[in-house]
């Protein structure tokens, strides 16, 4: 499943939409 291209701040993968992971070094989902 593709990650929607929406900038979302995160600390953990669970903060992101389905299909996304948290890029912890920039604190955004991707």
UniProtKB/Swiss-Prot annotation:
Role of this protein? Inhibits trypsin.
In the record's own words, the domains note is: The presence of a 'disulfide through disulfide knot' structurally defines this protein as a knottin.
The protein's UniProt keywords, in alphabetical order, are: Disulfide bond, Knottin, Protease inhibitor, Secreted, Serine protease inhibitor
SMART domains, alphabetized: PTI (SM00286)
Q: Where is this site: Reactive bond?
A: 5-6
Q: Give disulfide pairs as residue numbers.
A: 3-20, 10-22, 16-29
Task: Name it.
Answer: Trypsin inhibitor 4
Q: Which SUPFAM superfamilies match?
A: Plant inhibitors of proteinases and amylases
Its family? Belongs to the protease inhibitor I7 (squash-type serine protease inhibitor) family.
Indicate where this protein resides in the cell.
Secreted
Instruction: Look up the record and report any one GO term of the cellular component aspect.
Output: extracellular region
**Cited InterPro entries:** Prot_inh_squash (IPR000737), Proteinase_amylase_inhib_sf (IPR011052)
**GO molecular function terms noted in the UniProt entry:** serine-type endopeptidase inhibitor activity
């Amino acid at each position: 499943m593709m990650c929607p291209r929406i900038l979302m701040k995160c600390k953990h993968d669970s903060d992101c939409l389905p299909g996304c992971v948290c890029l912890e070094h920039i604190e955004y989902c991707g």
